[in-house]
Amino acid sequence: MQFKISSEYKPSGDQPEAIEGICSAIRQGSDAVTLLGVTGSGKTFTMANVIEKLQRPALILSHNKTLAAQLYGEFKSFFPNNAVEYYVSYYDYYQPEAYIPTTDTYIEKDLSINEQIDKLRLSAASALMSGRRDVIVVSSVSCLYGIGNPQDFHSQTVQVHVGQQISETRLLYHLVDALFSRTETDFKRGTFRVRGDTVDVYLGGSDEAVRIEFFGDEIDALSLIDPVTGATIERLSEVPIYPAGNFVTTKEKSTRAVSLIQDDLVKQLEYFESIGKGLEAKRLKQRVEYDLEMIKEMGYCPGIENYSRYFDGRSSGQRPFCLIDYFPDDFITFIDESHVTIPQIRAMYGGDHSRKSVLIEYGFRLPAAADNRPLTFDEFESITGQTVYVSATPSEYELNKSEGLVVEQVVRPTGLLDPPIEVRPTHDQVDNLLEEIRKRSEVDERVLVTTLTKRMAEELDDFFGKRGVRCRYIHSDVDTAERVEIIEDFKNGLFDVLIGVNLLREGLDIPSVSLVAILDADKEGFLRSQVALTQTAGRAARNVHGLVIMYADSVTRSMKETIYETDRRRSKQIEYNRIHHITPKQVEVKHNTLLAELGGNPDAAKSQGRVTASNSYDVPTFIPDPSALGKGRITVGLGDDSKRDTNTAYTDGYIRADLAAVLQDPVIRSMSREQVEKSAEESRRKMKKAAAELDYAAAARYRDEMWALEEYLKVWKND
């Protein structure tokens, strides 16, 4: 099937020239071209038209999950009949394995997987392996991390067709090799069930199942079914059943891998003994021998990705396979917001390598663990082929790579102008901003406020909320699905003011925003550079009443450059509108199709007044009293001490003894249920923040606090 755009709009403004310029450069064999497009000029629509004209598979690379979700929704709407896929990290929380030598602290890997995103990742790999040419994958930098060999993924795909001669038993063996597991009760993604001559397979990358009906040793019928009701959706003549996971291998490769791991273990043990590291040698021997037994018996072990080099057949130092290897040779890469995405790609390898080196040095992992890693920047460049850099503020790197092939897209199809910029003093800036917010709330328009710190964003949210303003804040500590849902609620008018730090700068498409307020605009730095200010100001460029207010007591060089460039663009846009008799018109709000797939609620309650994420609980008549009554663990007893029988063993619930200290805190014991709930959430937030900052010891501490508080809540009962 060919790419075919479904849209009521046609390219206009600067778009036709930009589309032709990019297509011409790609057809002539240019390695790179830059699309310099202002906010609201329809860069995504331009990319879609380039894909349609060139008819080549495409990777759309974004620098964070929120923007990837937005792009995914837009491309799904442009190409409803083509394979538009979504590929981001499937971890809601991820703390990698680490060792801190200074405190002799080993931290095990801890994670939480989002099943919906896992499904979408498998769907992306399956679409690329299907042989289809009409595939677009919208991805974060997660596509640079190692996954299974695409040849193994393809070879373990189970091809079935009506009339095929195969026994039911043999088919079941193939399904197990493809990482499906058998079940009779819990029918879910990645499982199959057998009922007489019928085998139902719940696909790994879909919400549908395949029913295979046998007549003897022949497949008699195939159908796509609803896994819940069993109702037939479609009759099939053939269907490929792709593996239920990305990391698949063959028995032969597994046997060879075990042998190679044993050989490398011997070498590393000899090395440790030769330099007098007996403890490290003993530690490594125990770990690897245990893992080998697990692999032999079960086919896997915890942390098996650290042995991926052996299963893939790679040599030491050779890059891992990643999603990009699943693409055909002639795919095109679009790097959205390239001025941010490129530096992020550059930084990925360093942090991973540093952590792995410590684990290897102290005997927790074999040296091969270092080859389970993200790509280096040079490796990324070597496999991406022709690339289109997309940004309103491209950096020197993109301009140099493009060798002068820069396509400018300044004029918007809607005729909208870049918003004018006003500079106002910081004295009484919050009160002044509150007045501006109320003006826009009266006419059902939205406001974005950008601060320098997360704390200030939260304090502003509290300040405005107490004054009747419907507001929310959003920053890096907010979970992925919640960020998407907050943005959707903002678009839908459930609240009027969205406050954030740097997350608001990049590509958020919110046409109802008529005011962008930049606090402390004269504090020169990363968040107030010319690039950052230009990007932030652009958030008001999709509204006919757009205005940018910079609160500052002086005008910095970055502010001057931003104001000058804005005035230049406005002059060009005004002249274009005059010549073509265009009157600026408001952009329609679009809904993000990914929200429901991530588990968000597009029909959230139409809250009146301030919107808040907190929940209310009934205050209990007493507080549970944790006390150390059991050896090795504590019993959480219920009721006041005065009501307890002296020698009674309370068995309402147990937690680990090493978590008990948290619950012995008199402050915790005096809290209401709502306060304990909030404390648990705060511990979760701190855990994620510490893990993101590679402070693994702190992350583990906050995780234990969170676990203890959650256990405390589980046994909460009213007297």
Placement of each model-derived feature along the sequence:
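Conserved pre-motif I regulatory segment
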Residues: 1-36
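Conserved RecA-like helicase motor-core motifs
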Residues: 80-89, 303, 446-448, 460-482
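Walker A/P-loop
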Residues: 28-50
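Conserved strand-helix element at the start of the C-terminal RecA-like helicase core
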Residues: 57-69, 86, 277-280, 440-462
